[in-house]
Amino acid sequence: MANRGPSYGSSREVQEKIEQKYDADLENKLVDWIILQCAEDIEHPPPGRAHFQKWLMDGTVLCKLINSLYPPGQEPIPKISESKMAFKQMEQISQFLKAAETYGVRTTDIFQTVDLWEGKDMAAVQRTLMALGSVAVTKDDGCYRGEPSWFHRKAQQNRRGFSEEQLRQGQNVIGLQMGSNKGASQAGMTGYGMPRQIM
């Protein structure tokens, strides 16, 4: 965490709960996908939360990832800077987040820049990358590289059309309880405030 002291008390408890949500197996899967998706000479980071954060922190890997999900010539981030200046790196992270939202990732699935930059919530970073992968698999536009089973396919609209005749036939169906006096009823129910009669 940059320029931030340790947290104490309830802040520490909250931070520990957030850190418990981080998934090391998911990290490996995401790293493999990012390297395969970008198809560039991207170095594989050592395992661990701190290394994963450092690998993504400058924003270049994230920008290359979002650009690789678009056809050539339509990349949303035309210039990727490899600057070591903090504000340039944070700007690249925010460019990635805007491009991910434009791509189709829901706002609720997008992490805050400080979650990655300060390492506050790396689980949120993982959730964003998972959501991005799910949208890419669902779009199925030929730009996704990787195993389709790595991410969940989002549900898509499947409208059904019924003819007038089918709707009329549905009105002729008799419900199973129509005309029956058996099954669930309110017989034996007492009103509120009345004592139970035990004999």
Swiss-Prot record:
PROSITE patterns: CALPONIN_1, CALPONIN_2, CH. Calponin-like repeats lie at residues 174-199. The keyword Phosphoprotein applies. Residues 176-188 have a biased composition (Polar residues). InterPro entries: Calponin-like (IPR050606), Calponin_repeat (IPR000557), CH_dom (IPR001715), CH_dom_sf (IPR036872), SM22_calponin (IPR003096). Keywords: Phosphoprotein. This is Transgelin-3. One of its GO terms (molecular function) is actin filament binding. The keyword Phosphoprotein applies. The lineage of its organism: Eukaryota, Metazoa, Chordata, Craniata, Vertebrata. Gene3D superfamilies: Calponin-like domain. One of its GO terms (biological process) is actin filament organization. Residues 176-199 are annotated as: Disordered. The gene is TAGLN3. Belongs to the calponin family. The modification Phosphoserine is found at S163. SUPFAM superfamilies: Calponin-homology domain, CH-domain (SSF47576). GO terms for cellular component: actin cytoskeleton. Residues 24-136 form the Calponin-homology (CH) domain.
